[in-house]
Each structure stands twice: as structure tokens, then as C-alpha cells.
């Protein structure tokens, strides 16, 4: 089974990527990283897109600026693919 790691999974791009991957109906698990602690809005947005099967998704709250935490996560998850979609949610913060 393939393990797909998505950073920024609860953001706009993460939601659309997750929806697209689940629609492919392939044998994989999705491990999402989010700085958010409330995942309900993420699942509600997936429902609006027509995704109702969340069995392949596991979301973790991890600090991506902590190298040791990220190294441990990579060892534990052993991802076959990584999509890095994390970043500031404000244009002003990204300047």
C-alpha cells in the first residue's frame, strides 16, 4: 500500500488534492499534516465536494519547523509520495 503525505492538507489546495486522490479509488492511505487543530471544517469541505469516505485519511498536528519532529514523522510514515502544500495563509505574511 502506498502512503501519501500531504503537508497543509486542511488548506484549499490540500482539500482539492485529497478529494482528487480519494476519487481515484486506489490502494493508499493519506497522512495529512496541519497546523490547525480543528479538522471538522476540512471534512465538511470534502463533503461539499462529494467525498464521504474518510477511511483513508489520517491528519496529524505537527510543527514543520521542528526538524526532529519531521524526521520522526518521515520514519514512522515512510511516505511513497510527498505533496508540500503548507505555507502562510496570508499574502502579507508571505512577502
Feature roles, as predicted:
Residues 1-95:
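N-terminal Rossmann-like NAD(P)+-binding domain of SDR-like oxidoreductases, especially those catalyzing
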Amino acid at each position: 500500500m502506498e502512503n501519501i503525505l500531504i503537508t497543509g492538507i486542511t488548506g484549499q489546495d490540500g482539500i482539492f488534492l485529497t478529494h482528487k486522490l480519494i476519487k481515484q479509488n486506489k490502494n493508499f492511505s493519506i497522512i495529512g499534516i496541519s497546523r490547525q487543530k480543528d479538522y471538522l471544517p476540512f471534512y465538511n469541505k470534502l463533503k461539499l465536494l462529494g467525498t464521504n469516505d474518510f477511511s483513508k485519511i489520517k491528519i496529524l498536528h505537527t510543527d514543520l519547523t521542528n526538524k526532529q519532529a519531521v524526521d520522526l514523522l518521515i520514519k514512522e510514515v515512510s511516505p511513497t509520495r510527498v505533496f508540500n502544500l503548507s505555507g502562510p495563509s496570508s499574502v502579507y505574511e508571505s512577502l
